[in-house]
Amino acid sequence: MAAGPSKSEIQTLFKRLRAIPTNKACFDCGAKSPSWASITYGVFLCIDCSGVHRSLGVHLSFIRSTELDSNWSWLQLRCMQVGGNANATAFFRQHGCLANDANTKYNSRAAQMYREKIRQLGSTALARHGTDLWIDNMNSAPSHSPEKKDSDFFTEHTQAPAWDTAATDPSGTQQPALPSESSSLAQPEPGPNTDLLGTSPQASLELKSSIIGKKKPAAAKKGLGAKKGLGAQKVSNQSFTEIERQAQVAEKLREQQAADAKKQAEESMVASMRLAYQELQIDRKKEEKKLQNLEGKKREQAERLGMGLVSRSSISHSVLSEMQMIEQETPLSAKSSRSQLDLFDDVGTFASGPPKYKDNPFSLGETFGSRWDSDAAWGMDRVEEKEPEVTISSIRPISERTTSRREVESRISGLESSEARQKFAGAKAISSDMFFGREVDSEYEARSRLQQLSGSSAISSSDLFGDVDGAHGGGTVSLGNVLPTADIAQFKQGVKSVAGKMAVLANGVMNSLQDRYGSY
């Protein structure tokens, strides 16, 4: 196995490689004088970027110092010779890898291909040149400095060396007059050359000016090449017009999309409503078919209890057809039993079909009012009074209304006051018992009862207090003897409301039973 390169050879090689203009800046960030190198890619890096490469791992980038490390191998040196910042930049740019992030850049397909290429070129150069320090394109680099004898000061500054002209002139053309002129100047005497003191040093001056002029573009390219794209760009009026037009087009497109979405939502809603209407119509036809299949008595019972959909009365409507008002005529007997305040009640509450959970059962008692209007049910004589005609002008506020009891009491008190005036007109003093007639009547009745029972051997409480009807049991008890007329009216109203509530509850129970067990 061949021995590794010596420290002097390593320093000489890197001194030459770092003298190349493209290798004088960091490959990643462009910092000046990089002193670290990535052997995997053959590029030169600054100390900060070398730390980033170390964090990527040795499988992606292997880092060494060009000044501190002395254990370089010949394969590593060949990789640095065949690589370089210029070659790496051209390869990455050619394969479209322009990312600045190190993790993205060196994990890309272009980085993988360049790693393989550098490894192959380094192995080929090592196999061809062995342990030679320079390869073909660098053989003449260290041999350009022969021993200098006594050189003339003017000759050094008027004639450029061959490697400078080759490096600065890319076309490789040289002026042929310079060698002949230099040889003719060196032949007469070895003393100092005084040709520059003459009147025509035009050729040499033109050469010097051309050399200086050719170095300026290279220097400008190195320092400012990466900052040309950061300048400001002038915006014309035409660009503003184009931007405004694009914004208007985008706004119109957005409005059209919103309108289309709204239209689609409406169409879907209409379709769902139509489907619901069709389902309702199918359910109604099924109920009608079930009702038609029932026999006579069962069908009558179902219609009477409100179980069928066909026998609905009063005001109703269907969602499957147009709105139609179906009014029911109220019987005369029901009209006569309503009071003045019944004008504000809802008509036909029980006739609108089966009750719902949201219905109020406390406002549904007036439907059965016609059942309690007969006189035989109460065992009393009904005083029929002609109800006055109710008009808008006759309706009074609640605060101004007087109940029937107050009106009766006011009439009775008026009669009693007139009779009392006539009876006690000449009396000087009267008592409350005398005014109301309690004292005389009670004493007379007590005396008469005692006289009647004076000869009997046993008496009962009914005989003592005169309860003849209770003792014989032949009479009938009526509410007229217990309650006044106004209280009877209120009592009847309460019974009507209770009966209505019971009817609503019974109807709801029957409907729930039909819904639960009707399909079996």
UniProtKB/Swiss-Prot annotation:
Biological process according to GO: COPI coating of Golgi vesicle; protein transport
Origin: domain of life: Eukaryota
InterPro entries reported in the protein's UniProt record: ARFGAP/RecO, ArfGAP_dom, ArfGAP_dom_sf
Alphabetical keyword list: Acetylation, Coiled coil, Cytoplasm, ER-Golgi transport, Golgi apparatus, GTPase activation, Membrane, Metal-binding, Phosphoprotein, Protein transport, Transport, Zinc, Zinc-finger
UniProt feature, compositional bias: Polar residues: 168-186
Zinc finger (C4-type): 26-49
TM stretches of this protein: none
Alphabetical list of PROSITE patterns matching this protein: ARFGAP (PS50115)
Coiled-coil annotated spans: 241-307
Location of Phosphoserine modifications: S140, S145, S200, S236, S239, S311, S333, S339, S363, S431, S432, S512
Residues covered by region (Disordered): 163-200
Membrane topology note: Peripheral membrane protein
Post-translational modification N-acetylalanine, affected residues: A2
Domain Arf-GAP intervals: 11-127
Any one Gene Ontology molecular-function term assigned to this protein's record: zinc ion binding
Region of interest: Required for interaction with coatomer: 97-520
Localization (cell): Cytoplasm; Golgi apparatus membrane
One GO CC term, this protein: Golgi membrane
Physiological role: GTPase-activating protein (GAP) for ADP ribosylation factor 1 (ARF1). May regulate coatomer-mediated protein transport from the Golgi complex to the endoplasmic reticulum. Hydrolysis of ARF1-bound GTP may lead to dissociation of coatomer from Golgi-derived membranes to allow fusion with target membranes.
Family matches, as PANTHER family: ADP-RIBOSYLATION FACTOR GTPASE ACTIVATING PROTEIN 3, ISOFORM H-RELATED (PTHR45686), ADP-RIBOSYLATION FACTOR GTPASE-ACTIVATING PROTEIN 2 (PTHR45686:SF10)
Subunit architecture: Interacts with the coatomer complex. Interacts with the C-terminal appendage domain of COPG1.
Record-given protein name: ADP-ribosylation factor GTPase-activating protein 2
Source lineage: Eukaryota, Metazoa, Chordata, Craniata, Vertebrata
Gene behind this protein: Arfgap2
